[in-house]
Amino acid sequence: MIVGMETENTKNANHRTGGAARRVVELSHPIRHGMVTYPGLPAPEISVHLSREASRDHYSPGTEFHIGRISMVANTGTYLDSPFHRFGDGPDLAGLPLDGLVDLDGLVVRTVDAQDRAVDRDALLPHPVTGRAVLIHTGWSRHWGTDRYGAGGHPFLTARGAAWLAEQRPALVGIDSLNIDDTDDLARSAHTTLLAAGIPVVEHMRGLEQLPLDGFRFHAAPPAVEGMGTFPVRAYAVLPGGEHQR
C-alpha cells in the first residue's frame, strides 16, 4: 500500500509552493488497452512482461515488482508532432529543445461557439501569439471515446490560419480535435506549414474548457526518442490560485 500519494480526486486540487497557491489542470487523455485514437490506426496493447508473482523469485521475501509492456503506434492518445513527423530532415523528438516544450506562456483561442468548423486567421488575429503555446479550444474533445470523434466533420486549422501562425512564431500549437488539419486536405496544410516553421503540434487535447484565456503555464514534453517524430505527452497547465474560466 502506498501512503501519501495523490489520488484521482485530488489531481486538480490546489497545491502550495513557496506559499503561493496553484492549480494543475490535466490536458491529456489516459492511454488504455484497446482504445482507438485515430480511425485506421491500431489500438495500444498493454500487457505484462514480468508479473509480481514471477518477480518474487528474484528478490527477498516480501519484495516484488511489476514490469509492463506496451505496443502502440506513436499517434496514440494526446501526442506531440515534431518536424520529423512531416520532414525527414527536421528535428526528431530528441532534437526538440526542452525549453520550447515546458513552462510556456499559455494562450487559449476559444472557437467552441463558432458556426464554422474551420479555424481561420480571423479567429487568431486578436491574440498576441508570438513565443506562446497557442491552444485552440474547439470543444471536439467531448466526443472522445465515441464513434462521433473520428467520423468526420471535426474542427481544424485552415491553411491561412497556419500560415499566419507560422509568421507570428508561437512556441507550440495545440488543438482538442481529431486532427489539426481537415482530413479531406491530403496536403495536410496546417501540419506542413507549422512543422516546416519548426513549431511543434499537440493533438487530441482535452480539458481546455478548464483554462482561462491566458495567465497559465503550459507543459508538454515527450520522451527524447531518436528517429521518431511523434509520441504521447502528458500535457498540463499550471494556473495561479483563484484562476477561473473566462
Where are these regions (language model features)?
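Active-/binding-site microenvironments in catalytic and ligand-binding cores
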Residues: 1-246
